């Protein structure tokens, strides 16, 4: 059985872009990879497949939600670097429960036996909400990764995620494999100065520092991974993903049980860090 990774972070922080590029980097290192998008927007795997694929919920609707009539091939698409992609999907905006759909998708994948078919399964999970179905990937994950930027709101959300992972680790095998620092800007944004202090405080570290670079924005608009953008800046943009992929595939990847901070404590600490 391979490793299962769950990627979390504040809404809009860049989880899907980071997940798609990390999945590709893992594949480039020789791993068989399945990425599962767990967001009603169903755009997690867009850079890998180049289009918005049919979601699990759409396939289930077509067969009246009879799981037994769905085949694995009905919900998976092969994308760049032979990365397989699945989108859970969800109800229309303003109705239903996206977390329920994620939970049902996780169950369906278990029925398919996919956890034994890949070297790496990566869940890209909606926002920083880890209740109900959105926490389901943590029940199967070996490792969680948090995507964050060097600002208060992002780090506050990361601390809440550390709380969830800390609690889950008492009942399951999941550990935190570190923080991906996103949109790192050493000129105007302080690099990762605050993020590094936070990581040290909660018993983890920043394991990748993805630069603030226009190539990343343009790759997302183009529906491509950075590995397909053969332009100036590609090397510096893909380097963090390749290094993190190598670390995750190593015999003993870095991983810890986080020691989250209280809400008031993090307010007080970060006021002094800024």
From Swiss-Prot:
Needed cofactors, names only, are: [4Fe-4S] cluster
Q: Which Pfam families does this chain map to? A: Fer4_NifH
Task: Give GO terms: molecular function aspect only.
Answer: 4 iron, 4 sulfur cluster binding; ATP binding; metal ion binding; oxidoreductase activity, acting on iron-sulfur proteins as donors; oxidoreductase activity, acting on the CH-CH group of donors, iron-sulfur protein as acceptor
PANTHER family membership: LIGHT-INDEPENDENT PROTOCHLOROPHYLLIDE REDUCTASE IRON-SULFUR ATP-BINDING PROTEIN
Q: What class of enzyme is it?
A: oxidoreductase
Binding annotation for [4Fe-4S] cluster: 97, 131
Q: What does this protein do?
A: Component of the dark-operative protochlorophyllide reductase (DPOR) that uses Mg-ATP and reduced ferredoxin to reduce ring D of protochlorophyllide (Pchlide) to form chlorophyllide a (Chlide). This reaction is light-independent. The L component serves as a unique electron donor to the NB-component of the complex, and binds Mg-ATP.
List the catalysed reactions: chlorophyllide a + oxidized 2[4Fe-4S]-[ferredoxin] + 2 ADP + 2 phosphate = protochlorophyllide a + reduced 2[4Fe-4S]-[ferredoxin] + 2 ATP + 2 H2O
In which family does this protein belong, per the annotation? Belongs to the NifH/BchL/ChlL family.
The protein's name:
Light-independent protochlorophyllide reductase iron-sulfur ATP-binding protein
Entry cofactor note text?
Binds 1 [4Fe-4S] cluster per dimer.
- Biological pathway: Porphyrin-containing compound metabolism; bacteriochlorophyll biosynthesis (light-independent)
* Stored InterPro entries: NifH/chlL_CS, NifH/frxC, P-loop_NTPase, Protochlorophyllide_ATP-bd
HAMAP family recorded for this chain? ChlL_BchL
From what superkingdom does this record's organism come? Bacteria
Residue sites binding Mg(2+) per the record: 16
Q: Which residues bind ATP?
A: 12-17, 41
Subunit info here reads: Homodimer. Protochlorophyllide reductase is composed of three subunits; BchL, BchN and BchB.
EC numbers on record: 1.3.7.7
């Amino acid at each position: 059985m391979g490793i299962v990774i769950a990627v979390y972070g504040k809404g809009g922080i860049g989880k899907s872009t980071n997940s798609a590029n990390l999945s590709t980097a893992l594949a480039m290192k020789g791993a068989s990879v399945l990425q599962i998008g767990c967001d009603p927007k169903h755009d997690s795997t867009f850079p890998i497949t180049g289009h918005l694929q049919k979601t699990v919920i759409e396939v289930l609707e077509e067969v009246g939600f009879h799981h037994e009539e769905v085949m694995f091939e009905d919900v998976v698409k092969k994308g760049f670097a032979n990365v397989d992609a699945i989108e859970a999907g969800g109800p229309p905006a303003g109705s239903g429960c996206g977390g329920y759909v994620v939970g049902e998708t996780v169950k369906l994948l278990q029925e398919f036996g996919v956890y034994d078919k890949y070297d790496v399964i990566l869940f890209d999970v909606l926002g920083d909400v880890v209740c109900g179905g959105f926490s389901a990937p943590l029940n199967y994950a070996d490792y969680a990764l948090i995507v964050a930027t060097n600002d208060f709101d992002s780090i506050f959300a990361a601390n809440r995620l550390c709380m969830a992972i800390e609690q889950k680790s008492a009942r399951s095998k999941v550990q935190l494999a570190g923080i991906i620092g996103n949109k790192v800007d050493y000129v105007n944004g302080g690099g990762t100065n605050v993020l590094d202090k936070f990581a040290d405080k909660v018993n983890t570290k920043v394991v990748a520092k993805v630069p603030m670079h226009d190539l990343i924005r343009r790759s997302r608009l183009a529906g491509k991974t950075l590995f397909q953008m053969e332009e100036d800046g590609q090397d510096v943009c893909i380097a963090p993903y390749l290094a993190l992929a190598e670390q995750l595939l190593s015999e003993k990847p870095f991983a810890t049980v986080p020691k989250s901070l209280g809400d008031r404590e993090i307010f007080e600490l970060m006021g002094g860090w800024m």
